[in-house]
Structures are given as structure tokens and as C-alpha cells.
Regions:
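N-terminal Rossmann-like FAD-binding beta1-loop-alpha1 element of flavoenzymes
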Residues: 5-33
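Gly/Ser/Thr-rich helix-start
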Residues: 13-18, 42, 49-51, 93, ...
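Conserved N-terminal glycine-rich FAD pyrophosphate-binding loop of Rossmann-like flavoproteins
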Residues: 37-70
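Glycine-rich phosphate/pyrophosphate-binding loop regions near the starts of catalytic domains
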Residues: 64-66, 75-79
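Feature captures the FAD/FMN-dependent oxidoreductase FAD-binding
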Residues: 78-121
């Protein structure tokens, strides 16, 4: 049996799990991503009618309800929707804005999943 060492194990290959794994990989961590589905990002592939509503330009801490209001402020300050848009642009993924700041891929949600998986390797 092969023995491999990982710095981070992420359980769940949905949007949040892929993002967590991607960010850890960007920071030089060796990441193992586990999911029960046969393919990670399966729900992302059907989101937004297959085009992935990948962020919203109107995301702001005051629009979230939380028992700890500082959590949203801190989380959104560390990685903003503009950071993700820049990443999408860097990977050459064309996108457009729909109603109320919703951003969608011009092509397929597969582009977002592929980008996140590439960032982990």
C-alpha cells in the first residue's frame, strides 16, 4: 500500500470543499480531497442552469444574518468576490452579469470545476 502524507484533508467536494482545497493548495499545502460522489463538483455542474452562478457582486457583510456578525465581515474581507472574479479572469473563463449582480460563465460550469481542480494539483 502506498503511504502518502497530506497537510490538509478536505471532506466534501462541493463548492465549499473545492474552494477550501484550492486555497490550501495555493498556499503550498499537500491536499487530499474526499467526496462520496463519483465526481467532485457534481452540484456545481448543474448550478445556474449548467453555467454556474459563481459569485455575486453585491455580496457584503451587512447582507448576512449571523449570531456573530463579525464572522461574515472577517470572512468576506479575507477573500472577496473580486478575488474570485480575478481568478476566473486569470484562467480565461468568459462570464457575464445577470440580475442583481449574479455572475455566470458564458460557457459551462465545467470550466469553474476544472479551474478549481487545476489549482489543487
Amino acid at each position: 500500500m502506498n503511504s502518502r502524507t497530506f497537510d490538509v484533508v478536505v471532506i466534501g467536494g462541493g463548492a465549499a470543499g473545492l474552494m477550501a482545497a484550492m486555497r490550501a493548495g495555493q498556499r503550498g499545502r499537500r491536499v487530499l480531497l474526499l467526496d462520496h460522489a463519483e465526481k467532485v463538483g457534481k452540484k456545481i455542474l448543474i448550478s445556474g442552469g449548467g453555467r454556474c452562478n459563481f459569485t455575486n457582486t453585491g455580496a457584503a457583510p451587512e447582507r448576512f444574518i449571523s449570531a456573530n456578525p463579525h464572522f461574515c465581515k472577517s470572512a468576506l474581507a479575507r477573500y472577496t468576490q473580486h478575488d474570485f472574479i480575478a481568478l476566473v479572469d486569470k484562467h480565461g473563463i468568459a462570464w457575464h452579469e445577470k440580475t442583481l449582480g449574479q455572475l455566470f460563465c458564458d460557457g459551462s460550469a465545467r470550466q469553474i470545476v476544472a479551474m478549481e481542480l487545476t489549482m489543487n494539483s
